[in-house]
């Protein structure tokens, strides 16, 4: 069973991830993952620190992700389970893009996370975005 400290550290990891991707901190983004960590998103799968760093650096300028460039990741309803050095987490995701006087929600979905403690620090081993609504989604 995870301790309250473990759960707090995992919540902090989620927040550091959001801050890094929203502010263009590619090194900080990659550092939230294990060295062999994997991110599975709507524009592809990225594995390992070099690939993750390149994805984060390209995030704001890649035409495939243009709708997301100025958006903020809002994550809530985080549920963490696990034991020892392994954990899973579920959270709801909403991406909000500032538009003048208002903001608009441009993505709704959830994350499924697999986490591992490495050298005393929690990291994402795998983070999967399950997007239900986003620009360009034609449904299934």
Segment roles from a protein language model:
Residues 19, 63-68, 100-101:
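Short helix-to-loop capping/linker segments positioned immediately adjacent to catalytic or ligand/cofactor-binding
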Residues 73-75, 106-111:
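Short, surface-exposed coil-to-beta transition loops
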């Amino acid at each position: 069973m995870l301790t309250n400290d473990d759960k707090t550290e995992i919540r902090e990891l989620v927040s550091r991830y959001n801050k890094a991707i929203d502010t263009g901190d590619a090194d900080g983004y990659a550092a939230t993952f294990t060295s062999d960590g994997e991110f599975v998103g709507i524009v592809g799968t990225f594995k390992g620190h070099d690939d993750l760093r390149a994805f984060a650096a390209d995030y704001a300028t890649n035409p495939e992700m243009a709708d997301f460039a100025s958006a903020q990741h809002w994550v809530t309803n985080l549920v963490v389970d696990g034991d020892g050095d392994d954990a899973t987490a579920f959270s709801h995701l909403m991406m909000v893009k500032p538009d003048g006087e208002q903001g608009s929600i441009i993505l709704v979905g959830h994350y499924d996370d697999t986490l591992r403690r490495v050298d005393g620090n929690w990291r994402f081993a795998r983070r999967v975005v399950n997007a239900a609504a986003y620009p360009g989604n034609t449904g299934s």
